[in-house]
Amino acid sequence: MKRTIFAVSFLLFVSLLHSQKTDHTKQIEIIYNLSLTKGKAYNWLDHLSNQIGGRLSGSLNAERAVFWGKQELENLDLDRVYLEDVMVPKWVRGTFEYASIITGPGRSTNVPVCSLGGSISTPASGLRAQVIEIRNFEELESLGEENVKDKFIFYNRAMPAGLINTFEAYSKTVNQRSQGAEKAARLGAVGVIVRSMNLRLDDYPHTGNMRYGNLPNKMRIPAAAISTNGAQLLSSMLSLNNDLYFYLKQDCKNFPDVPSNNVIGEIKGSEFPNEIIVVGGHLDSWDLGDGAHDDGAGIVQSMEVLRLLKKMNYKPKRTIRVVLYMNEENGLRGGTTYAKNAKSRKENHIFALESDAGGFTPRGFVFEATKKQFNKIKSWKSYLGPYMIDRFELGGSGADIGPLRNGNTVLSGLRPDSQRYFDYHHAANDTFEAINKRELELGAAAMTSLIYLVDQFGF
């Protein structure tokens, strides 16, 4: 009799598990179907990119994006939509930059350049000086002040093409952009030219943030990025004649901080409203292009998560919140302000997901989690396998959600295919035309599915 009862109980348990799995599978199927057939992310991104455009912190376009984001979230009939005050830096590019390689009296070759974010301007008449090519900071230090003083330093360390993970390649080269001016200035250089962070050879210079550290204003020097084709040309010419001169003209300027906002919307949890699940991207972008991949795609995908859940009449157990962060590109003020305010309110964030790697085909997610948490996450992998989401790895999640890191909150980042991302990253060709509608929608569906699973199972 006991064996019979045990057998029946076991069969009921297995049946219940199968039923639950089937139910979750069906829900994820609905999410993907809605995203691919009735999605709104692509149309949202069309407006954000083409009607608003580049959205550098402190600019009019950034404020237009805040107004647009709040209005669109209010249209979703969420439980709450509000703005969070953030003070952000204001840097203005001014007129477009000009540069040339001077090969002799009356002879020069123009090359594509752009100011690096945060750089100072050149004198109004421009800056002309001898140029020296180096690959790393060790080479710079070995030259010493006597060989660097009054010269342009040309940082020409290319992203390693042999690395499959292009973000790893980026991490091995980006310090020349972020720290190059400070280090060269300390040795008396008059300016720096940095090879663009781009694996492809083309004529688009790629901007990005740089910093002077604690350098006094009088020691600061102009910094610009040169396109990869321009870098190849300059390097080739220097190999033939190491007595070349370079000319740079730019009139960018830093201003005092100005007020801006994060945009936040949420659906209140029905069972555990104090457990918060956050999804987001950054609303600001660089000013050369439209910021379609970086990070317009992440913004509309994050908004789409809440829209899809509402569309399928899903009632979340936990509070699901979308945050459109301001100022990731040149200050991270939005992310740090959000985390600071959340801590002061003693909010319990159990999970945070960020999309800031472009709108390409999603491959999976990376997680910052404990062993126990990650084992639970891996048990969900079978739900997303049919949609070719097979990368579940431990690793860095995202800049904006990083300030929420506390040892308990699980942090995650969407990881699309990255091979084309740096073709567009921080460049003038990061436009809506570079977006594939289906890839964008697949990313939104993958994110929504993961948020659904976290809400269902928790930690």
Please place each PLM-identified region on the residue numbering.
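Second-shell loop/turn segments in exported
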Residues: 28-36, 50-60, 97, 118, ...
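N-terminal capping segment at the start of a domain
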Residues: 23-59, 96, 204-207, 212, ...
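Active-site-adjacent substrate-binding region
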Residues: 185, 195-196, 213-216, 232, ...
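Noncatalytic luminal/extracellular "stalk/propeptide" segments of secretory-pathway proteins
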Residues: 24, 30, 46, 50-164
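Sec-dependent N-terminal signal peptides
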Residues: 4-14
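Soluble metallo-hydrolase cores and metallopeptidase-like ectodomains found primarily
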Residues: 25-27, 103-104, 113-114, 118-145, ...
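A conserved hydrophobic secondary-structure block that centers on an alpha-helix together
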Residues: 136-199
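Acidic/histidine-rich catalytic neighborhood of metal-dependent amide-processing enzymes
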Residues: 179, 259-262, 285-376, 459
